[in-house]
Amino acid sequence: MIMCHKCNTLSCLILTSLFFNLYVLVCLLFTYIMNKGQQLWDNKSFHYITPSLINFISFTKNTINCFTTYPNCSFYSIRKRKSRRRLTRGVSVLPKMAGDETAIVSSGNMVFEPILEEGVFRFDCSTDAKNAAFPSVSFVDPKVRETPLMNIHQVPAFVPVFQSVAGQQVVTIELPPGTSLYGTGEASGPLERTGKRIFTWNTDAWGYGSGTTSLYQSHPWVLAVLPNGESLGVLADTTRRCEIDLQQEASIKFVSQPSYPIITFGAFASPADVLRSLSHATGTVFMPPKWSLGYHQCRWSYPYDARVREVARTFREKNIPCDVVWMDIDYMEGFRCFTFDQERFPDPQDLVKHLHQSGLKAIWMLDPGIKHEKGYFVYDSGSQKNIWIQTADGKPYIGEVWPGPCVFPDFTQAEARSWWADLVKDFISNGVDGIWNDMNEPAVFKTVTKTMPESNIHRGDADLGGPQPHSYYHNVYGLLMARSTYEGMKLAHENKRPFVLTRAGYLGSQRYAATWTGDNLSTWEHLHMSIPMVLQLGLSGQPLSGPDIGGFAGNATPKLFGRWMGIGAMFPFCRGHSETDTIDHEPWSFGEECEEVCRLALQRRYRLLPHIYTLFYVAHTQGAPVATPIFFSDPKDPDLRKVENAFLLGPLLIYASIERNQQLDKMQHQLPCGIWLSFDFKDSHPDLPALYLKGGSIIALAPPHQHVGQASDTDDLLLLVALDEDGKAEGILFEDDGDGYEYTRNGYRLTTYGAERQSSVVSVRVLKTEGSLKRPRRRLHVQLLLGGFAKIEAWGIDGETLQILIPSEKEVSNLVLLGQQEFRTRIESSRPIPDENDGAGHKGVELSRTPVDMRSGDWALKVVPWIGGRIIAMEHLPSEKPYSMIYSLKHVLLVYYMLFGYKVREAFIALDDEELLLSILYKLLKEYGSSSSY
């Protein structure tokens, strides 16, 4: 029995002798949380979802506000294995259920109907459930999801089973043993997701780890590769918090509030076919301007105009390719969006003009938080239009972010999106080339949940779901903000393609914005994770992504930075970024040896830009992925399904070293079946990835310009050719103006090149051309790969047949031997990157903010000074036992599993992973660590 000190209500909990001590600890811990919420968090809200106990609860001041029609109450009682759960004022929290709190109300196979195209099915629990489902936000056209196809007579290969448990809709799909699971969007951890669990709840996840369960974006989507290589995509089309449980082998489980449909894509012949089908529903990636595929240099922050100019000048002086320089939040006046600090950035138009003269673009940040300040034109105009998100009592919600107290636009309203788009249009007149939407989960300071109350109200458009609580719109807030920004940029320049980068997103965000993997750490672990994270986003419909190269938080070492740049230069989105109070993280900041590796890496990228740009054209027009796991080359091969240090850019395979002490030339490369020919640009280095081209392929290359604007139609065109077993190869090249929309009006050139060996001659010719753009008179340079870094070169004119004479077998063997010798010579003569700053046992990061040692009673904590504090280590002094964030989380959740059952454990992970519980624990230890009751 535990007595609530506030309302004298008894909380009856059944104790088990086996876990008695843990039980008492947790009961006391959460009694204090409920009773001391006001003192602990300065009247700030603490929200969590517990599906098997109550729907939505918010601890604020001395009451518990239960959303969804439940009135305020001062406490609530929990009675294990009772048929009703009541608040002290007698209001039922859950519907009456028989027996245990996890009793199943209903279950069965879901009913289906074909939609969209052949092989795509919608599943609902019942006709009533279908009618109760909210509109789709992920679909380009929500009506498509609601319209069954009448001429399709297929039946699905796999039928989901549903259960209604404790007010939750649980959907399970069982697949054949040996199935590999991928997708889940922006997720840390391994590439193959079996054994993992993800919660779709957009979260400001600074310094996330490999086990973090909620990051900045939500993709309730799983890609399953069956044992025979066929693939199936499964979408839980809900915007609410959703658990994706992949802990059981070959089993997919979704848990969320009802009602939501399940959409399956396939099974199709390959994972690429599934992603193409998904793009028909959720849309393809926007066509990026070509300059956005170059290298981007960012920093939180370049503090003033002169420093930006200095960085730009240094890139050109050091002959390091770069296309974009970014301005983080400090360019603003007092962090007010759409303003410029008059002292530090007095003339943004002149700055942009200067950058443009150097061939550089400028991208500027815009956050959703608008300072609550009369006289500030953005606040005044938004208030006049009444477009702010509201609290449950109808007042504008005010939360603290960078400017201080802020209001937040309600992007679920067309009027608010139009208002924001007009602001963006005016902002672009300063010469802004691109916009960066940050903090749009939305992140809010000084709250344990790091976001706004779920009880806040959005007055959404009917086609989005109408007026709903924030819990419904939270996961799509970033998508809708990115959409508004994108539309504002189109208003400003109808003949320029917008470029928007968004931190938060949802399935379908690729229609409006690129993304990155958030606030990572300068560690070898995060370098490793960056590859599967980029690939998972691509496998979830977002092909334009990349990490903060070098790591955002912490000081990279020279070797870590150089290795990361080598890999990052091959990602679809290529940007270096670091946080304030770290050392400089520009390519020249780590010594001459690292600078040279960065130069070589970025020159590689710029050579490959014609190929990368072509991949994005195919992604935009056909929904094909850009960067893919290497099992895409042979989905039937189970040995390829967990490879995390290699990936494909079309037929180009990038093999990277992700271990600190493992140089690339010492590694054994696991290649897919078939012909894979190694090559380089006479730039091989132990810290750069190895490159292979698949037999049967042709890719186009360009000179390594300093920026995209230097390229010309009359530049030499280089074709890299790798013949297959039949002596043939084929590839495409897409060309247009690199910006604008003429390509939609036939103003482009799509060339299919072919190569074929006949006897001792290989002929290279144009097989097909699409588009009205005329072929320029330019030289054609063909390199025919022989393997072992050997090649035969020939010159001709683009558009004319070029014939290459193949030497004898002995001469080819000698060329291969010579190529291998030259490769070894380049490796041995390269200057290794020193790493004297990376001490033994250290993961490669020096925290940019010195941890503060704090002690409370029997506990010692290390906290990184930050907004609200970040706990990085805990130790129980009497036992000298350290507790990492994950380990201590497991202890707490284990107790919850024993006390309240499986669903409660899931609910607490869904909230905020380990940081939530540890933040609570820290606050309690600080208040009660020395108390006898604790």
What are these regions (language model features)?
Residues E836-Y934:
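Surface-exposed acidic/polar loop and edge beta-strand patches at domain peripheries
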Residues C4-C7, C12, C27, C66, ...:
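Cysteine-centered motifs
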Residues G696-T801, F823-T825:
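Accessory, solvent-exposed terminal regions and/or long lumenal/extracellular loops of proteins
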Residues S92-P95, G99-L688, L693-K694:
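Catalytic-domain carbohydrate-binding cleft regions of carbohydrate-active enzymes
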Residues L664, K682-P686, W795-D838:
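Solvent-exposed, conformationally flexible loop/turn segments
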Residues F123-C125, I654-S657, V762-E770, D858, ...:
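Short, well-ordered beta-strand segments enriched in hydrophobic/aromatic residues
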Residues L10-T31:
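Hydrophobic alpha-helical signal peptides and transmembrane signal-/tail-anchor segments
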